[in-house]
Amino acid sequence: DGIRDRLVTGVQTCALPIYPHDRISAKHYGVNPTGNGRRDTFRNLPIPRMRATYMEAGNMKEADIISKVKNGIFVDTFTNGQVQIGAGDFTFFVKSGYLIEDGKLTQPIKDINIIGNGPKALADITMVADNDKIDNGTWTCGKDGQSCPVTCGMPSALVSKLTVGGEN
């Protein structure tokens, strides 16, 4: 929407200090636009959208985090994420990963779902690794019938509670 983008710090202590806005939503809420007005073609109106979502690295080694997990999963690649805006409920399809058993990566896994709630999952992060990872830029944000390319990145992190494959 012609507004220069700026850093929008998403989550600090599990609260959004600044929400992504386009010109219209910023005016409605009486705040400054953040440069998040995006559209997939000139035929569509800009709407507030994600651009690049990233989680800062922590100070632990990935191997140290894995070694502290008795039973869990390590997700290497996921896709087809969906989020219910407002409630924050999400689901992601795991393309590849591993079981974690007694602190070690064991059996390969694939074709399972991870289901959770965004704010709760953020609150349940107990460890964050120092290994920055950025995706290859193949994500798409779908909203109001539009699709826009987005990117994301994060280090390895331990989320203590999520639903996996429909079971707790």
Where are these regions (language model features)?
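N-terminal small-residue-enriched
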Residues: R4-N168
